[in-house]
Amino acid sequence: MPRHAHLLSALLLVAVPALPALAADRITGQPFATRSEVHAPHAMAATSHPLATQIALDTMKAGGSAVDAAIAANAALGLMEPTGNGIGGDLFAIVWDPKTKRLYGYDGSGRSPHSLTLAEFQRRGLTDIPSHGPLPVTVPGAVDGWFALHGRFGKRAMAENLAPTIRYAREGHPVHEVIAYYWDRSVPRLGKWPGFTEQFTIDGRAPRNGETWRNPNLANTLQAIADGGRDAFYKGDIARTIGDYFAANDGFLSYEDLAAHTGNWVEPVSTTYRGVELWELPPSGQGIAALQILNLLEPYDLESYGFGSPEHVHLFVEAKKLAFADRARWYADPAFHPAPVERLISKDYARERGALISMDTALREVQPGTPKQLDEGDTIYLTTADADGMMVSLIQSNYRGMGSGMAPPGLGFILQDRGEQFVLREDHPNGYAPGKRPFHTIIPAFATKDGEPWLSFGVMGGAMQPQGHVQILINMLDFGMNLQEAGDAPRIQHDGSTEPTGQNTAMTDGGEVDLETGFPYETVRALMQKGHSVRFSHGPYGGYQAIMKNPHGGWTGASESRKDGQAAGY
């Protein structure tokens, strides 16, 4: 650990009092700031922006389904929070349909350009795919996802769902604090890419907190989609503009790549934990890491250890290390490298891997398991629920903040840089190939009890996402927190595991444990004695939204303070 990190830890050991002392001045009994859950009898929405939440509610009040509301809110977030998402990115969703009483999963991720080969990266002397510019760009799948979800579950016309965002894009809306912060950080990194400064700055700078932002180009693009449907984006003038732009700027994404795009309906997969069944989408995303971590934690009595105890943090971190070793080895596009999903999320496999966990010593090096096939496999998150009982868990992203920085002229959005997550090796499951989906970090979550819907939730934020999913559930199921407290509680994030992107070498030092402010000094000392390298950092620790089915009727919502968001209902 760097010397300054040791000094910071030492200072915090003195400055941070124990949990019981902190709890004394809060009526909730919790040692951290929180607020009330939100309850409503008919419908609920929770998003990372208050205006998007209101748009979702207005959509359902006008007769739209939870899917209509999710699409309307996602469109709004693409305008209002371009630091995390937009129609240049991908989309994943899980929908609970009250008519069929089952879950439906959608993988709306795009593929790499067919004309960009591994040999081209090698010709350029690259060992990693750049974070920005034309090379990491993959086909954006979000708009396709909207229309796929709408075609199965929508009630209102797509034009009605997009109308509020089109109006805000033309007339303007005030930029919120967290978004302004990340926007300001993005401008110096992305300003050199063609079209970014012209379309995403005000006189060369980011819009400030409270300042009005307009995006008439995006309004025109959304209007074209509203009028022409899905094909207006993938097979019309929008696709031609994108193809021409990349051809003129050393890029490879083409009209043909966009025209060939298809998303996929997929079956969610699950595991059980303390009487609850957690559902995630299968790879190429990382959702099953949350299932693996829960399976590894299940044998331990976390409730008796208590939230924030050394045992709680240690066990969570060790389980994460084991799951993420498999994540680096197995998670990839199943069309190219199918993962042994059923085995990876099985209880038997968790028992085998769990034998590596010691209560006394932190693992420093973790190899992936060798699961054999069983006989016979920056981001925004939002959730909505309607009066009919439909629930939507939806996540959408540009990948790294504002994406690649590549902003085709006149369109008002930025293309994602998801291709950065490929490995430039043929022998790796996540190795680059034309027409392939990269490993994905964005994952929606859903939980059921006794076959009935219970909780739609998500925690955006890269590798934090499966770690966040697990922490929300154990906060509720093991530590007795309510829906809002579960998201507001201080978080743990372990960094340093081997990555499926190939950008981290194999972990040999145990990685680093980042703790958000609020963990007691006794815990920090005990973790360090076990061999953990502990840091207190500003994060990010993700962004949480959730809706729970209220057992007394109606809905309960939550939205945490780490984002600009809001949960509201009617």
What are these regions (language model features)?
Residues 1-9:
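Bacterial N-terminal signal peptides that target proteins for export
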Residues 9-20:
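Bacterial N-terminal signal peptides
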Residues 24-54, 66-228, 233-235, 239-285, ...:
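Noncatalytic scaffold domains of N-terminal-nucleophile
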Residues 59-60, 144-152, 228-235, 240, ...:
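Alpha-helical support elements that line or immediately flank enzyme active sites
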Residues 79-83, 89-104, 252-254, 390-455, ...:
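Active-site rim segments in enzyme catalytic domains, especially the processed small/beta chain
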Residues 265, 376-379, 440-442:
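Short, small/polar residue-rich loop motifs at catalytic or cofactor-binding pockets
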Residues 299-398, 410-411, 418, 538:
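Internal maturation/activation junctions in enzymes
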Residues 388, 436, 469, 478-539:
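Extended C-terminal subregions enriched in glycine
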